[in-house]
Amino acid sequence: IEVPHKELDYETVYLDEFKGNADKEKYQLAIYDTNHILIDILKDRKSSTIREFLLCHKDSIKKVGMDMFMQFRNTVYSCLPHADIVADKYHVIRQANWMIRDVRIRLFNSDIKYREYKKYWKLIAKNPNSAFSPSQKKRLKKLKNLSEIFSRAYDLRTKFFSIFEIKDVTIFSYELKNLIGELKESGIKECIKLGETLSNWEEEINNIQKYNINNGFVEGKNNKIKVIKRLSYGIKKFDNLKKLIQLRIS
């Protein structure tokens, strides 16, 4: 079966791993172009495999969108020192959600008086800048009054979400740097950890607003890949999996 040829634009490429379980490798890597067209499926996510692809297109690639996987970042910078990496917004925001989750779990495991942090986990996990009903606002206020640690962590997460609504790149960068400082100085271990993560990825996070690109479209592509694998009864040979994905997604 011949895969149809399409014109590809390599100026921006997006890297995204998925669980393919092919040829004894748990993960494979999908690569998409500027227009979200599938470029290639790599047999694994090893640095040597990614390096081979990047070096083949080093003169064309200017920006790389990716999740917050240090191995990917190190490989991209070593092959493409002049390219800009753009962190995926979804994965960045998830870091803040993990922070409040870990604070919540630590507290309700430490004392029975914090059991409501377990009961109302959905309310706590909700986007803090979304609409809350009067009863939800009242409950959230009670939850914050239970613990200064939780209240401070929740407020910092709220500020984090608010920063991503800023469109001006300079202001975004300024507010992000301030937030990182607040997180590191909070005295809350989960917040400090988040601050360190954001600091390590600060340039790539700033590039989210600078270039206004993200890997959001990849979720739909991954869902299609999952369907392909399910309908093919968990195809195990990589070459067959690759051709099938290229036919269905390209």
Model-derived segments and their meaning:
Residues 117-185:
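Helix-loop elements that line ligand-binding/catalytic pockets
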Residues 111-125, 237-250:
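Charge-dense polyanion-binding interfaces
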Residues 1-75, 82:
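RNase H-like nuclease fold core
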Residues 85, 192-194, 199-250:
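Amphipathic alpha-helical/coiled-coil segments positioned at domain termini
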Residues 67-71, 77-121, 219:
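Conserved beta-strand -> loop -> alpha-helix junction used to position metal-binding or nucleic-acid-contacting
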Residues 162, 166-216:
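Amphipathic alpha-helical
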